[in-house]
Amino acid sequence: LNSKISDYMKQNKSKEEASILARQGFVSAVGRALEKIIELLLKDFCIKNNVKMTNDKILRAKRINGELDKVKRALLVHFGEYSVLPDIILYQTNKDNVKILAILSVKNSFRERFTETPYWKLKLLQSPITSHIKVFMITPDNDDEISFKNKPKKALSWSMN
């Protein structure tokens, strides 16, 4: 982080602004790494079940094929001048049709972005075309924001469906 802060300060950023920018870059890199880990863990499942997987970074590319364009159009949410896509998308294809099965919202820090996942489900419920899509939030809960009085004996899976 210190070298990034120095780089930003060389660009005439204040120390405070440079620190914020460096931290944001670090947090973004950690988040993307977590998404990649989830994708690797799901790869075999997808192959065995004839499920395809993509992510927001791929869908934001300038040139995507027709299949990915259909996935993108099915999920793109607009906020004024901004457009938002979910982190990871699981889908199947059948001839010219694309069926979105699930979106995975991957959050390294539960605290800062926990409202995004339920928001996705609410948006998807507004249309009969997307209301079937499952929505899952995946987090390592590094900040221990999701806690239990007695630790559960089995791993938990939360679904917003």
Regions found by a protein language model. Name each.
Residues 30-35, 81, 110-113:
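Phosphate/oxyanion-binding active-site loops and adjacent basic polyanion-contact surfaces
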Residues 107-113, 142-145:
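Short acidic, S/G/P-rich loop/turn micro-motifs used as interaction or catalytic elements
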Residues 56-94:
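Active-site metal-binding core of divalent-cation-utilizing nuclease and nuclease-like domains
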Residues 1-54:
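Interdomain/boundary linker segments immediately adjacent to catalytic/signaling cores
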Residues 114-129:
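Short, charged, amphipathic alpha-helix that recurs within catalytic cores of restriction-modification
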Residues 102-103, 131-139, 161:
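Hydrophobic beta-strand segments of well-ordered beta-sheets in folded domains
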